[in-house]
Amino acid sequence: MVRTKIFVKEDTKMLYTEKEKHEIERVKEVFAEHLRQSPDFELLWSDKVGYVWLTIGVNPVYVDTGIRIESAADLCGRCLDDVATDVLYMTGNDHALEAADPLELAEIKRRWELYINQLPDYAYLCKDLLDGKM
């Protein structure tokens, strides 16, 4: 068996600026309880690529796709989308967020309010999600 050693340059580009990482961690803290209890994903730190949104399942146990979190807005959008998806699952309707009925929309907006009150700079993401732009 031939082993290949992979060299990593010490001067590789920083994953996030200090400001970007701080803002991602602020969003992570606001959504901490939601992130902790979700059975559908895990937010992990990698020294190689930064934060990774990992799609998982717990029954049955599986690991699916991993997506690198590019920014605080990226993380916030994914979390808001997951909150909305929880409402759609709760109502038993199998449709996209853009097709949510008025009662579903009211509940989604009510749940989003908890987070957006703490992260007002990201309120525009709610409209983007509802308009199918994300």
Labelled PLM ranges:
Residues 4-6, 23, 27, 35-37, ...:
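Positively charged, low-complexity intrinsically disordered regions
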Residues 45-124:
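Acidic, low-complexity, intrinsically disordered interaction modules
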Residues 9-11, 32, 38, 57, ...:
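Intrinsically disordered, low-complexity peptide-like regions
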Residues 1-13:
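Short, Lys/Arg-enriched N-terminal segments with co-localized hydrophobic residues
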Residues 129-134:
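Short acidic DE-rich linear segments
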Residues 11-13, 29, 74:
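Intrinsic disorder/low-complexity segments
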Residues 15-45:
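Negatively charged, low-complexity tracts enriched in Asp/Glu with abundant Ser/Thr
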